[in-house]
Amino acid sequence: RNLTPSKFRQLFGELSPAQLTIIKDNTSQHIAVAAGPGSGKTRLLVHKLASLLLMEDVKHEQLLMVTFSRAAATEFKKRLIELIGNAANFIEIKTFHSYCFDLLGKVGSIEKSQTIINMAVKKITSKDIEPNRITKNVLVIDEAQDMDAHEFELLKALMEHNEEMRVIAVGDDDQAIYGFRGSTVEAILSLEQYFHPLQTLYLTYNYRSHQLILDLANQLFPQ
């Protein structure tokens, strides 16, 4: 699909060259983005979802984004709606747990959430799930560094089920927010071990620090 130059500028004109490189990459099957604090990770992910829909031949039912909290999923959906409008409502943005509950056709509960990912992995690997339930061709992962061993096994199971699946994993390899639940920074680093070839890209510019410096300079040297 082709966007007019003016529409492209409207959607993506404020992105940095590094962010645009990731947006325009439509050939790499496996992409890992190491994004430092304040580097525009959320903006990148929202715009990558938009580019998959509007610039590539990805249908909304083929696209899944997973994150680690319902609050994050809600925020991503809100920002995507602001960017591309009503089309965003058809994109699945879920937590790992809610995706597994949907996959198995079960109602979510706190008790079941402890085991639902392992159950999903077993069902996928034993081919005990109806094929029409696993239809995703593109998987986008937020905070990939926070994947624990169970979530990483789910990722591998989905990849083995569909060897053509594209994976776009974005995270900070220096930070594991959910370390208390078994997550380690090895998750994002392990992508290179399991997924070949892997295109690794970096976002290092800290917009937040840059803005703090500008704000401080404005206070010290008012116009």
List each language-model region with its residue ranges.
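Hydrophobic residues in beta-strands of the RecA-like P-loop NTPase core, especially within AAA+ ATPase
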Residues: 141-147, 171
